Each structure stands twice: as structure tokens, then as C-alpha cells.
């Protein structure tokens, strides 16, 4: 059995470890575009607050660990195309430029997600950061040393956690959210209000129903955050506008929802029985938090 895993995310490496532990005779190949594997971005806030002391501890495993289990891991390799009809993939070696084909019996799509970059004027400003990967986590950590006033744009999980992290490090934090309550995809208004009170108790300035429309340079090397309600001068802004699944390789070949997340059954199989999906690339079939956001899941 030849299993191919695209993406060495937490989900991809966990799948490789499980397969090789239970079925060591399986030939497992992992293709990864980056030079590192299994970075757990959801724990970035733990690094910023010092609970995790070393950024390297945010890696779920290492290429050496996977090789020891028997996996063939190819970093700096970008999968260009998947042909599900013939069970082949086209891969580019990003260091040499070589392009080649490979085959699989079973494929696991663990390509994760990418940060949503909203169309905000000035979002490419040097004082505006994103939050997802290893390099961005290091930038955020360095920013703690030099900045006192920080604007967080977006109050989903990541934005809310970052607001708490920066506030705990004695930074002045403003949290902007275009919705009427924070964590609106996960919590109902009552629980969200309780979370807001906790943030405010830690001196986080929460701005609800306030959409950021632009970033410009201000006086004294400041960054100006522009909204319809007013302008705010800060030292740094971090945009946490959500994530989109990296599933373009399978678009039109397996069933997806309207956001591009791959639909799976209870065994994480896609509509193609030889292709599985895990992590941010696929839907979540059971989310108990939805019970608190809407009555519809209970109907």
C-alpha cells in the first residue's frame, strides 16, 4: 500500500505517525512546500506569553522523527496537480526546479489553511503583521519588545487570544471586530459578552461593529488605523481575519462546501473513497460549540 500525504501540517504528520505505528509496512510519502513540518500555529499565543519558551517547541514532530518511523518526507516540494482518475500527482522540487510525477493508492489531503488577507488599503504596511506560520510568529514575538500600543483586527479565536497575550505583556491593546460580538462563529452573545468582560478586565479596548478600512503612516513613525468611526494611532497592527482551506488542488474532483472545505464522512473519506482529508482542509462534522450559537443544530 502506497499512501501519499500532501502537507506536513499537524494533521498530516499525525496521520503519518498513526499509519506507520499501526502498519509499518506501508510506504508513506509526505510532500511539503516549506522547510519545516507540523508547526502548531494555534499555540502562537502561548509562545508570546512565555508559557512556551522556545518557538521550536511549537513543532509537533520533526523530519528526523518521521524518517525514523519509515516515512519518506520531501520538504521544499510543491504539488502542482492531482489527477484523481489516474491516481497521480505532479510535483516540483522547489530547490532544483525538477518536475516529476508520482502515484498513490491512498491520498491524504492535509494542506491546512492560509490566512485571509482582506482588501484593506495599506495592509502591506511594514507595521501590519499577519499571524499563521513560524516566521510570522517570530515577528510577533519581536514586536513585543518594541511596541506598546497594538491593534488587533478580527476577534475570532486567533485575534482574541492575541489580544489577551499582548495585554498580559503590558501592551495597550485595541481589538477591532466588525460583528456585534466577538467569537461570533463559535459563541452566542451571552458567552461572548462574558469573554468581552474578561478582556476589558485586562484593559483590552474592545471595538465592536467597527470595521477597519485602512492603514496609513502617522506622525512620529506611528501607524494609523482607519475606521468609519475614527482614526487610531498605534505602534503595530496584527490582522486576524480568518483562514481559508488550501484545497485548490482538488477543486472539481471531490465534494466541497461553499468555503472550499472538503466534505468528509465519519472516516474522513472524501467523495473519492481513495482520498482522505484532515485538519483545516476539511469540514468539521461535529462541533459542540454550535449548540451555543444557534438553535438549528438541535432541530
Segments predicted by a language model, with ranges:
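Catalytic nucleophile loop
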Residues: 12, 156-159
